[in-house]
Amino acid sequence: GSIYVLNNPYYPVGDQISATAFAAYCRDGNFIMLCSGGYVGMYQQQKGLGILYEMLFALFGNFNYTPAKILHVIWWVLAILAGYGFLKLNTDRAIFRIVYCIMMLGCIPFLLYLPYIYGDVLSISFGMVMFWAVSAYEHYEKKRYIALAACVAGIAVLARKNTWIILFGVGIF
């Protein structure tokens, strides 16, 4: 995965470039995109992604997409491991974990299609970690798992507002 994203000449376009431009502008003290006619003023859900990129740009420089691409791969691996861990805690039958791993191979086109962070992979990954953490809390009864679930839930919602759906699922679970 890392070799693919590092060798892929993909650069953000459309909404992606607007979200990263918002982060770079904010780092320079220009908040024009927050106005009612600005990009983030019209698309409020992009604030979280802009904050994520603002942190990445603060560490690695404006419009440096390489760290974002590497994080994309790390979050995919984290999502796969969290899902596997969730199944390991909730079932003793290995067939479910085997089927899960085979089904996760179906996500490879998503990785190839999106070698760049746009919030989807982050929210999926941290949503999976949240399910694992809640399940681990039920299994081990250690408060650190609930703290982890709360932290990753907050980050997941920050990246993508539709992650609220997962939070309702956890509440029902």
Language model regions located:
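Transmembrane-helix signature of polytopic, membrane-embedded enzymes
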Residues: P67, I80-G106, I124
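Membrane-interface transmembrane helices that cradle and orient dolichyl/undecaprenyl
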Residues: K88-T91, M130-Y145
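Short acidic/glycine- and proline-prone juxtamembrane loop motifs at membrane-interface regions
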Residues: L112-S123
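Extracytoplasmic catalytic/substrate-binding loops of multi-pass membrane glycan-assembly enzymes
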Residues: N8-F22, D28-L52, L59-T66
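Transmembrane alpha-helices of multi-pass, membrane-embedded glycan-processing enzymes
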Residues: Q44-Q45, L49, Y53-G61, A68-G83, ...
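Membrane-interface alpha helices of multi-pass inner-membrane proteins
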Residues: Y145-R160, V170-I172
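Short helix- or helix-capping micro-motifs
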Residues: V99-I108, W132, A153, V157
